[in-house]
């Protein structure tokens, strides 16, 4: 039940094992095009792969999304915050107008981006200085592209692929020439946001 599998079924794959799945998909989406319900199967993350900071969010079936951003600078201390400084935000909004560009590429709009705390607000608790910020990764534009598994890597700018290469290609040579995961692209800022399969509440409970 992957987006890649849906693509293969929609484009006449010879694999007949997914016939029941394709019937189920057809009942949900007559056109066979990508829906927000497809994207709701994934969690999305924007980070460098080196740890320290990340932006994480999930999209629901209606296009709404919710997530958080965090970064830390434990060396940035003061009299009241000897344990360092944290940058963070909680955010929510909605993606709309999911439009097909080609077999592997869609475009969508972002609306109503709101924050749990006002960006710029600061507070100190438990020896840590908390600074609330804008969300890193979704700024600078209200238009985003979605690239699906199978999309040629050459369709992405070097700046964008830099952010997702480590999640997309586990070969030492870096020879993967197509996407293996869905990604969201902020072209205005040159950001690529990778994805992984979303856990169910039961799976999340088991992993904690």
What are these regions (language model features)?
Residues 1, 95, 144-148:
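Generic hydrophobic, helix-prone segments enriched in Leu/Val/Ile
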Residues 50-120:
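N-terminal glycine/threonine-rich, aromatic-flanked beta-hairpin/loop signature
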Residues 28-56, 66, 187-207:
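Tryptophan-anchored aromatic micro-motifs
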Residues 117-207:
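Beta-strand-rich cores of mature extracytoplasmic or soluble domains
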Residues 37-39, 60, 139:
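Surface-exposed coil/turn segments at beta-strand junctions on protein surfaces, enriched
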